[in-house]
């Protein structure tokens, strides 16, 4: 099985402006437990300080998964059981915030490269290694560090099949 960490490609693409919005307040107050469903059909603008090109993956703050309707339509049936989607509108164009479910006990702690705070909390994971014998949904976040979203190979392949998509980057993770 192949597992990929997905994230926004920083390459001159526009970003969704959250500064000064209720969404920013919710993220600051709740961190990784923010509930995006509260913002269904809310209108957003592009940030003035971002790039010039609109992409299909304008993640919020670099790690909150946002897909264009084109991409979401391609993978909807694969992820509906493991993620919640919230429709938002950015300057007239529909996007979907995707909140993948958190799963636990799938990260191979011994093989992963993890940087920790003095109190033991995870600061960063430089190398994600997943357990071979675990069960994985099509899309997920890990309970230990729910900052990034991961997909299995079939989901990434379906995304890649959507012609003309831009803005997604991904990293293959080890499965041992």
PLM features: residue spans?
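Phosphate/anion-contacting hairpin/loop surfaces
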Residues: 1-176
């Amino acid at each position: 099985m192949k597992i990929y960490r997905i994230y926004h490609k920083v390459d001159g693409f526009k970003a969704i402006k959250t500064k000064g919005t209720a969404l920013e307040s919710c993220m600051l107050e709740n961190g990784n437990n923010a509930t995006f469903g509260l913002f269904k059909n809310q209108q957003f603008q592009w940030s003035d300080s971002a790039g010039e090109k609109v992409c299909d993956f304008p993640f919020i703050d670099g790690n909150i998964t946002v897909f264009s309707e084109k991409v979401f339509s391609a993978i909807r049936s694969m992820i509906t059981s493991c993620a919640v989607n919230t429709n938002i509108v950015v300057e007239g164009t529909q996007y979907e915030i995707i909140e993948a479910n958190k799963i636990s006990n799938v990260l191979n702690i011994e093989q992963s490269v993890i940087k920790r705070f003095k109190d033991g909390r995870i600061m960063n994971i430089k190398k994600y290694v997943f357990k071979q014998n675990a069960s994985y949904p099509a899309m997920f976040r890990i309970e230990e560090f729910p900052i990034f979203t991961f997909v299995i190979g079939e989901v990434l392949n379906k995304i890649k099949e959507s012609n003309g998509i831009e803005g997604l980057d991904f990293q293959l993770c080890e499965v041992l």
